[in-house]
């Protein structure tokens, strides 16, 4: 359940970021068409609703379709690997987990960099003009591909866990259970994502009702919606470290057992929380190591050229 919840938060964060980027793109395109490119891109709910509302569900549907394709690939692949090279499952999952940690650290560094070096109006205008020059459809497709890539790693973990549960069952049962879980998870997760990203539209709809109670509820949703998306972004990034760190830790048996043993010596409450906290911290450390490794490789390649 913890993995499923963390995976959902990671996906929500990815899609929330994706929708924000596409919202900026859409608003820029609209301003460009009008022959105006303003400085103010504070994408509040009212400004974004005309553009963003048209693309929210298509974007979620695009990622959901990619998620289904991921599972169509992963289910038979998992069965083949399990049958012929079962030892490869754990290393492959660990690579995926390390990649999630890497993405989490990249997000944190990007956020810190943005806070450290705030743009002046000229830099902001230059960046926005560069963004506006891009093809909106290609931009959207590229963003969706990134979300589908994250989904692939999380889907692989869910498929692997399910396969571990039904490993001793006949092949037909394994296929049916894996396919059923894959379908239910995809429909459930992206159905919930679709509801969450339409909260602001629900708020507008309720705010226009004649009932004072409905209007108050609608206004409340409009106030909550942007804060909810910000909270999801923070919690989703933490979930990347939690899921990714957990995958890597589980793949290193001595480390996993040491954490479990240490947690078992603590009080009941601490024993329940400690493994999660340690997975989170280790996830950040793992991500940091991968980022340093990637930057070192990029530096060497730059020197080679």
Swiss-Prot record:
Which topology term describes how it sits in the membrane? Multi-pass membrane protein
**Which positions form S-S bridges?**
none
Please, which domain of life does this record's source organism belong to? Bacteria
Q: What is its main location?
A: membrane
Membrane topology, Cytoplasmic segments: 1-71, 114-151, 198-231, 293-305
Q: Which InterPro entries match?
A: YedI
Residue ranges of the TM segments = 72-92, 93-113, 152-172, 177-197, 232-252, 272-292
Q: Which UniProt keywords apply?
A: Cell inner membrane, Cell membrane, Membrane, Transmembrane, Transmembrane helix
Segment forming the signal sequence: none
Would you name any one GO CC term? plasma membrane
Taken from the record's topology, the Periplasmic segments are 173-176, 253-271
Q: State the compartments where it is located.
A: Cell inner membrane
Under what name is this protein listed? Answer: Inner membrane protein YedI
Instruction: Give the gene symbol.
Output: yedI
């Amino acid at each position: 359940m913890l993995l499923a919840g963390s995976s959902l938060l990671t996906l929500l964060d990815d899609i929330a970021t994706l929708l924000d980027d596409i919202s900026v793109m859409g608003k820029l395109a609209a301003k460009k068409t009008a022959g105006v490119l303003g400085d103010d891109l504070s994408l509040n709910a009212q400004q974004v609703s005309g553009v963003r509302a048209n693309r929210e569900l298509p974007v979620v549907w695009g990622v959901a379709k990619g998620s289904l394709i991921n599972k169509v690939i992963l289910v038979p692949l998992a069965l083949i690997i399990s049958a012929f090279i079962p030892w490869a499952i754990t290393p492959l999952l660990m690579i995926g987990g390390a990649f999630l940690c890497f993405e989490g650290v990249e997000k944190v560094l990007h956020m810190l960099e943005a806070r450290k070096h705030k743009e002046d109006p000229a830099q902001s205008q230059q960046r926005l003009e560069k963004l506006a020059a891009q093809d909106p459809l290609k931009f959207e497709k590229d963003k969706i591909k990134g979300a589908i890539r994250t989904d692939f790693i999380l889907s692989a973990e869910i498929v692997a866990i399910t396969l571990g549960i039904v490993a001793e069952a006949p092949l037909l049962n394994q296929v049916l259970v894996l396919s059923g879980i894959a379908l239910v998870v995809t429909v459930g997760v992206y159905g919930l994502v679709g509801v969450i990203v339409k909260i602001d539209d629900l708020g507008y709809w309720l705010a226009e009702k004649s009932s004072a109670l409905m209007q108050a509820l609608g206004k409340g949703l409009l106030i909550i919606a942007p804060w909810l998306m910000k909270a999801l972004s923070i919690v989703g990034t933490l979930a990347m470290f939690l899921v990714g760190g957990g995958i890597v830790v589980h793949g290193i048996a001595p480390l996993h057992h040491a954490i479990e043993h240490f947690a078992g010596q603590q009080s009941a409450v601490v024993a329940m929380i400690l493994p999660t906290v340690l997975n989170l911290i280790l996830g950040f450390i793992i991500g940091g190591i991968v980022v340093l490794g990637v930057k070192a490789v990029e530096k060497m390649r730059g020197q080679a050229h």
